[in-house]
Design a protein with these regions (language model features):
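A common structural junction motif
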Residues: 78-88
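Short S/T/G/P-rich N-terminal loop/turn motif that feeds into the first structured element of a domain
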Residues: 1-57, 63-75, 93-115
Length: 115
């Protein structure tokens, strides 16, 4: 079995739009490294972040290594190591995670596999 990909649909919780974007200005190399280290430890990786408008929604393509269950992935996205936490925000996003059916796209993911 190989890694799997997810598309994550993010929407802002009430009152979080301005706080999110203000804090993104402070998302420096140190915070990025912490977030990437947490991803590595959890066996997940965000390939791309795609905001559609300042007010949202935002979409991301994530990869989870073999052995990471769907619920473990959702728990990471919603949990204490989510990006918003490292921006000094308390869980600013609602996150709908949808696994991509690799069989429908020829067995490969939308990006070259990291795992």
């Amino acid at each position: 079995m190989a890694s799997k990909f997810f598309i994550v649909h993010h929407t802002f919780k009430p009152g979080m739009v301005e706080k999110w974007w203000d804090n993104m200005k402070n998302y420096d190399e140190t915070k990025q490294k912490i977030h990437l280290d947490n991803q590595t430890e959890a066996g997940v990786y965000c390939h791309t972040f795609m905001p559609t408008a300042k007010e949202g929604p935002m979409f991301c393509i994530w990869e989870a290594k073999e052995g990471v269950s769907d619920s473990e992935f959702q728990n990471f996205i919603d949990g204490p190591n989510a990006i918003g936490v490292h921006m000094d925000l308390d869980h600013p996003l609602n996150n709908h995670c949808q696994k991509i059916d690799h069989d429908l796209i020829g067995g490969e993911g939308p990006f070259p596999r990291r795992f």
